[in-house]
């Protein structure tokens, strides 16, 4: 049995902190990470930038979280080993970075893993776009062709519009696009 949650609103780092904090989780037995906090900070920032650029309605999904119930027999095994093995298998199978935590609920009736994972992979080299000529963006962040399109009646660039001068970086990506396998579906990992 498992549930899937989307981590939204610049909260992947907050959610990681919450599930891995002994101060906030009284029945926390083990935690495990395949990527450091810099990875998750960069992922959150780039996801938010992509979301704003897309102009999509709703909320930005920075990462996904699975909550996987384990049979109580797993309480007999060493918690760190259970969590490490499970997380590394998920990482190997899907090729994604993860943070995980092994918990019991307050009544100790539900032994479970929280597994947060990235839908994007780190690129081998950052993809940096440098303006070969001046680039103009309107108030919504949409690229326009000419300076005239973002200039007000007073001859000044309108508030909220942006000009990127020739030779400046106007876009950079550290991550791939989202893996579509994870969109709107549950992942069943019990067939291992």
Model-predicted segments: where are they?
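N-terminal nicking endonuclease/strand-transfer module with a His-rich metal-binding environment
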Residues: 1-4, 8-191
């Amino acid at each position: 049995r498992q549930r899937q949650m989307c981590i939204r609103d610049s909260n992947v780092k907050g959610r990681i902190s919450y599930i891995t904090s002994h101060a906030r989780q009284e029945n926390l037995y083990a935690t495990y990470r395949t990527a450091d906090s810099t990875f998750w900070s960069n992922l959150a920032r780039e996801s938010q930038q992509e979301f704003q650029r897309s102009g999509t309605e709703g909320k930005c999904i920075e990462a996904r979280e699975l909550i996987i119930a384990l049979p109580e027999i797993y309480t007999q095994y060493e918690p760190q080993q259970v969590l490490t093995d499970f997380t590394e298998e998920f990482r190997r199978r899907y090729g994604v970075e993860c943070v995980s935590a092994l918990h019991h609920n307050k009544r100790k009736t539900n032994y479970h893993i929280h597994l947060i994972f990235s839908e994007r992979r780190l690129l081998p080299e950052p993809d940096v776009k440098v303006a070969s000529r001046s680039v103009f963006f309107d108030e919504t962040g949409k690229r326009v062709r000419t300076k005239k399109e973002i200039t007000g009646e007073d001859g000044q660039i309108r508030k909220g519009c942006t000009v990127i001068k020739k030779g400046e970086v106007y876009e950079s990506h550290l991550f791939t696009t989202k893996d579509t396998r994870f969109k709107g579906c549950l992942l069943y990992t019990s067939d291992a």
